[in-house]
């Protein structure tokens, strides 16, 4: 389990690992207890992730579980994303509003990161969680030409770099990376990896606003 605080305290982040178990299958009460203990969060909100560019507010997610791939909120509730190769991203603005984003290649191409950042205020910073990297992400699908057109620098031979694609998006929208985990989910062994055989299991990345806003 890994904790990260944004440098100015605007947001707090928690990332679970393989040793913490499958957080998708875990009972809701266990997930809630986890974020309460490690993030001092009042609740955990999640979405039914569908590889889209849909952004859902914490208030909407609290009413009922909704489909989408980015959650935006403010305050002591933890916003979460479940992944096993896609990129889990935490965005936070200078006012303490937070977004958690699920970004695989489909989401990046659809503009989920831009859509989430648009729902935040100024001076947005980012934490980038563990995901599959170019060392292991062989990609030969028919979608490749479209991805190469949008992200010309994202392919190294037959291997896809989600980092390169994400870096281009951040540069275009003016988001600064202030933290992350420089590990590949497939070859590090510390996290679940869909391509590494973890077809159903997922690890959790969760975040809430910093203490001064809670």
For each feature predicted by the language model, list its residue ranges:
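Active-site microenvironment for binding and transforming phosphate-containing groups
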Residues: 1-214
């Amino acid at each position: 389990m890994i904790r990260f605080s944004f440098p100015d305290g605007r947001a707090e982040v928690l990332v679970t690992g393989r040793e913490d178990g499958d957080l998708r299958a875990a009972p809701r009460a266990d997930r809630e207890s986890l974020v309460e203990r490690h993030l001092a969060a009042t609740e955990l909100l999640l979405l039914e992730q569908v590889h889209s560019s849909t952004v859902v507010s914490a208030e909407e997610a609290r009413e009922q579980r909704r489909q989408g791939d980015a959650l935006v909120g403010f305050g002591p509730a933890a916003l979460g994303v479940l992944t096993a190769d896609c990129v889990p991203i935490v965005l936070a603005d200078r006012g303490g509003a937070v977004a958690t984003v699920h970004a695989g290649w489909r989401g990046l191409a659809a503009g989920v990161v831009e859509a989430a950042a648009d729902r935040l205020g100024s001076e947005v910073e980012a934490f980038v969680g563990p995901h599959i990297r170019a060392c292991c992400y062989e990609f030969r699908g028919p979608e490749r030409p479209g991805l190469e057109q949008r992200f010309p620098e994202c392919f190294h031979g037959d291997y896809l770099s989600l980092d390169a694609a994400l870096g281009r998006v951040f540069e275009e929208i003016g988001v600064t990376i202030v933290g992350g985990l420089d590990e590949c989910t497939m070859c590090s062994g510390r996290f679940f990896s869909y391509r590494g055989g973890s077809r159903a299991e997922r690890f959790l990345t969760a975040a809430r606003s910093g203490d001064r806003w809670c």
